[in-house]
């Protein structure tokens, strides 16, 4: 069977179309393209950043087509500078308007076509190239839902507190 891509490698920010996108750090335009396929990125920009001796990239997907008309390869972008806008669903791959932000340590020569999702079986490989973008964004942990307990932890709790005379019906807890 063909395993579906279910692991998201970036962070999505659902905002209105035409919302300005600001650079979280100073950088240089490394690549851009219109990935104009259904359920793809649509207009995409990749910035290259250098912090001390560390080089990494940020990818911005689901932008407006106008964003690509106003940008050039090698263009310097200042910290906090607006450099793009979020696209409409008609131009961003058919998605509800939002910004896809992804941090990438090595583009693997994929540039603007770097994947934003991967198969669960490949999670370890792809997340080694894509650290958590919240380390850059800084949304407080309290803004995220609590992690669900693992199946093993759920089973252990049930075994501890539910009597053997009680039956439960499920394939997996």
PLM features: what roles do these ranges have?
Residues 2-38:
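Short, glycine/small-residue-enriched coil/turn segments at secondary-structure junctions
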Residues 8, 49, 62, 98-100:
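Histidine-centered active-site/metal-ligand motif
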Residues 11, 43-45, 97-99:
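Short beta-strand micro-motifs in enzyme catalytic cores
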Residues 13, 27, 47, 80, ...:
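Terminal peptide-recognition signature
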Residues 16, 22, 72-78:
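Residue-level recognition of short, solvent-exposed, well-ordered loop/turn junctions
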């Amino acid at each position: 069977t063909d395993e579906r891509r279910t692991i998201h490698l970036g962070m999505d920010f659902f905002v209105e179309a035409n919302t300005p996108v600001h650079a979280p750090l100073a950088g240089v335009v490394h690549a851009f393209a219109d990935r104009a396929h259904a359920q793809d990125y649509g207009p995409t920009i990749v910035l290259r950043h250098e912090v001390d001796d560390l080089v990494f990239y940020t990818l911005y997907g689901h932008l407006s087509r106008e964003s690509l008309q106003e940008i050039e390869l090698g263009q310097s972008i200042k910290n906090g500078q607006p450099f793009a806008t979020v696209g409409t669903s008609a131009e961003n791959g058919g998605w509800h308007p939002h910004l896809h932000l992804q941090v990438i340590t090595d583009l693997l020569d994929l540039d603007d076509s770097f994947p934003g999702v991967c198969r669960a079986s490949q999670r370890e490989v792809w997340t080694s190239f894509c650290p958590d973008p919240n380390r850059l964004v800084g949304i407080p942990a309290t803004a995220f839902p609590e992690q669900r307990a693992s199946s093993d932890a759920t089973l252990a709790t049930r075994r501890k507190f539910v009597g053997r005379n009680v039956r439960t019906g499920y394939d997996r807890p």
